[in-house]
Structure formats: C-alpha cells, structure tokens
C-alpha cells in the first residue's frame, strides 16, 4: 500500500488540514465519556505543531442534519478536551468552509463538525474544492471513516496540493495488514454487538478467512435462531436467519467453526435493576431476553482465545455496561489480555469495553475504526485510502 506519510513531508510554515476522527461518546449533559479517539489523533497534531505548521483539525460528531448546527452536534467539548491534552487553548471555528479565519504557525484550531456542511456526505465536488483551498497539505488521520467517500475524507484529497496519511492512519493500515494478509493461525474473529444487519455481510467474508468465528450480542441471537433455538424476546433479525445458516455452512465446509453459546444470562428487561438468571440455551422462555453469554460459554470462548495465533475483536458479547451482564465480555477481554497472540481490536463499544476492563496495554493494536476496521478485514477497497494511493502514484 503506497501512500505519502505525513512524516515524509516538511510541514514547517505550511497550512495543514487534518481530517481526524474525534467522534467520541458523550452523556446527556454533553460530557465526553470515553476519549480514546482524541488521544489517538494527538501524534499527528503534535508533529505538525512542533514543526511550526498552521494546523486545522476537523471531524464529524454524531449524525447532524446538514446545514443545521445544533448544540449537541458541536465539537466544543472536543475543543476543550483537545486543549487540555495539548496544554494550549484550541479555538473552535464555525462557518469555516469559505475561509475568513487566520491560523498562525504553531497554532491549532478545530473546525466545527464537518458533517454540518452541505454536501459533506455526498462528497460534493464544489465543497471539496473550497476546503482544499484552505491548505497546503491535506492529512487523513481518520481511519474510522476511511470506508466512506465524503468531502473531508475523499473529495478534498483530490484537490489539495498534497494529500497524505497521518500517523494514526499509517499505523492502522500496518496493523490490519499484519492481522489479515499474513495472520499467524489459528485466526479467531470475535464479532459482537447489536448491529446485526450491518455486520452480517462482513461475517460472510470473515467466514472464508478465519478458523473460529465467535459471535455475540444481537448477532449471536440470530445465529441461535438459525440453529433452531428459542430466544424469547431477545434482540435478533429473523429475516437474516438464512444468511446465518450460509455463514455456518461456509465455516463447516472449511473445517472451521462458529461456536454458539450453550448457556446464557437472561432477564425480563434491560435495566440496572434487572435480575439476571444463568440458564442453559435450551431453557430460554418466551419473556426472556438474552443479555450475555453464560459462564460455561465464556470459559469455552476464553479457551479458543488462549489457543489463537491472531485475534480480531469487534464488539462485546453482552450488555457489558450493566455489571450483571458483563461477565462474558469481561472473561473474553481477560483472555485476550493474557493471550500470546497478536490481537487487534476496534469499534466504539469494543473501545469502551477495553477501557472498562483496563486491558488497553495488553491488546496488540487498538484500532479507532468501526465499520472501516471490519471492511478492511473484508478486503474491500476503502475510498479514503484509495485516493491517497492515487495521489502518491
């Protein structure tokens, strides 16, 4: 993969536009609850500041309506947190597309939520050209959005005088290549979470590559349905049962497996006060909701992880935010932390689980990408990386 790297360039005195991924979770009061993505963007920003560049950073946050900036869509909390990390004040610039603001060499500003700009998501050419005029060097450091061709991830890279990969983007690509192109076997993928339909096609692709495919959350429930099990009121997608069957068949033909839960933790509601019951997967009642894997299943998953050569982790296996449904994810996280295998983990919920169980130092590489992380594993062309390759040619 041939791209220009930020560290290959002389950025001193240059106007540098960095597209970062600062899409961090916030609570209802607007407080940032987990800041891994901001921390991950620091190396490129610091590198440019230390070299005396005039630095502009932008990101998306949430899913705003284009053309409307609402309070909850503002990057203001991110500007404050970024300033604390850099020990400097970071100005937040609104209505920035047409310029009209000044950035001094050695200064960094944050450009307000790029998804508020009309034409961002549709990769509008006119918008991309305007943004390209703001800089001498465009840096894509947002691996998390590399699978989307948008104006700040793709369009601007066509028109900026120079387009390169930031330090995070470069590290992401190197780590993912190591996990995918030459993985040490057995290769184990853990795919969990509630976004069933968005991950099933990716599961299909992983089915032809991995030795074991551990599924969790809403995804596992769909597989349990496919296996003829009753899942009560659990989150699942019955219309995708056929797809789940196909995945299990692909794995079986290769001598690989999808180890399904044999015991589960159920409750009649998802709440902090819910009473958790550990039962066999054959004893799920009509009103039960499966909210975690049971201890026997967790131990089985831990054993698979202990014997792995490479581990790819995206998504928890239960509602780990609530302590009574966190056991499965906790045991799995611990197994990954203690494993000798090269492990790569990614996705918002996964990052939160890693933080909760304090295993960040024991994971081989933590990816900041969710969908991009999985699509790269699938071998899809990521538009944001493809355009950087094109510009380097």
From Swiss-Prot:
Q: Molecular function terms in GO for this entry?
A: ADP binding; ATP binding; phosphoglycerate kinase activity
Q: Name one GO cellular component term.
A: cytosol
Binding-site residues, ATP = 199, 321, 347-350
Q: Which GO terms describe its biological process?
A: gluconeogenesis; glycolytic process
Q: Does the keyword DNA damage apply?
A: no
Report the Pfam families cross-referenced here. Answer: PGK (PF00162)
Write out the entry's keywords from A to Z: ATP-binding, Cytoplasm, Glycolysis, Kinase, Nucleotide-binding, Transferase
Q: In which pathway does it act?
A: Carbohydrate degradation; glycolysis; pyruvate from D-glyceraldehyde 3-phosphate: step 2/5
**Binding-site residues for substrate, renumbered to this chain:** 21-23, 37, 60-63, 115, 148
**Superkingdom as given in the UniProt entry:** Bacteria
Substrates-to-products reaction catalysed: (2R)-3-phosphoglycerate + ATP = (2R)-3-phospho-glyceroyl phosphate + ADP
Return the EC number. Answer: 2.7.2.3
In which compartments does the protein localize? Cytoplasm
Instruction: Output the SUPFAM superfamilies linked to this UniProt entry.
Output: Phosphoglycerate kinase
Partners and quaternary state? Answer: Monomer.
List the HAMAP family.
Phosphoglyc_kinase
Q: Which family does it belong to?
A: Belongs to the phosphoglycerate kinase family.
Q: What is this protein called?
A: Phosphoglycerate kinase
Tell me what gene encodes this: pgk
């Amino acid at each position: 993969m041939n791209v220009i790297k930020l560290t290959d360039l002389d950025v001193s005195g240059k106007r540098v536009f960095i597209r970062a991924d600062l899409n961090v979770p916030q609570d209802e009061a607007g407080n940032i609850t987990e800041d891994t993505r901001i921390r991950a963007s620091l190396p490129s920003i610091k590198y440019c500041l230390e070299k005396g560049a005039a630095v502009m950073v932008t990101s998306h946050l949430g899913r705003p309506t284009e053309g409307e900036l609402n309070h909850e869509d503002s990057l203001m909390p991110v500007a404050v947190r970024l300033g604390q990390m850099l020990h400097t004040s970071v100005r937040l610039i609104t209505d920035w597309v047409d310029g009209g603001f000044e950035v001094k060499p050695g200064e960094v500003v944050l450009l307000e939520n790029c998804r508020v700009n009309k034409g961002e998501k549709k990769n509008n050419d006119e918008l991309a050209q305007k943004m390209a005029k703001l800089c001498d060097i465009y840096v894509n450091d947002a691996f998390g959005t590399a699978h989307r061709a948008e104006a700040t991830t793709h369009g601007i890279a066509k028109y900026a005088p120079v387009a390169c990969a930031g330090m995070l983007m470069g590290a992401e690509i190197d780590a993912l290549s190591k996990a995918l192109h030459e993985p040490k076997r057995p290769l184990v993928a853990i795919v969990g979470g509630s976004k069933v339909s968005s991950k099933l096609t990716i599961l299909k692709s992983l089915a032809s590559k991995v030795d074991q495919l551990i599924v969790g959350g809403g995804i596992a429930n769909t597989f349990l349905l496919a296996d003829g099990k009753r899942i009560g009121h659990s989150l699942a997608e019955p219309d995708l049962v056929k797809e789940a069957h196909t995945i299990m068949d692909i794995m079986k033909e290769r001598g690989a497996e999808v180890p399904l839960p044999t015991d589960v933790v159920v409750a009649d509601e998802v709440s902090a006060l819910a009473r958790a019951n550990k039962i066999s997967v054959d004893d799920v009642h009509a009103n039960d909701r499966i909210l975690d894997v049971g201890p026997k299943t967790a131990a089985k998953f831990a054993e698979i992880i202990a014997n792995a050569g490479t581990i790819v982790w995206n998504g928890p296996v239960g509602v780990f935010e609530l302590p009574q449904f966190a056991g499965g994810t906790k045991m799995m996280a611990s197994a990954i932390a203690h494993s000798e295998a090269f492990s790569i983990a990614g996705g918002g919920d996964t990052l939160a689980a890693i933080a909760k169980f304090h295993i960040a130092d024991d994971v081989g590489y933590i990816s900041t990408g969710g969908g991009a992380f999985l699509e790269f594993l699938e071998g899809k062309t990521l538009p944001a990386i493809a355009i950087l390759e094109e510009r380097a040619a």
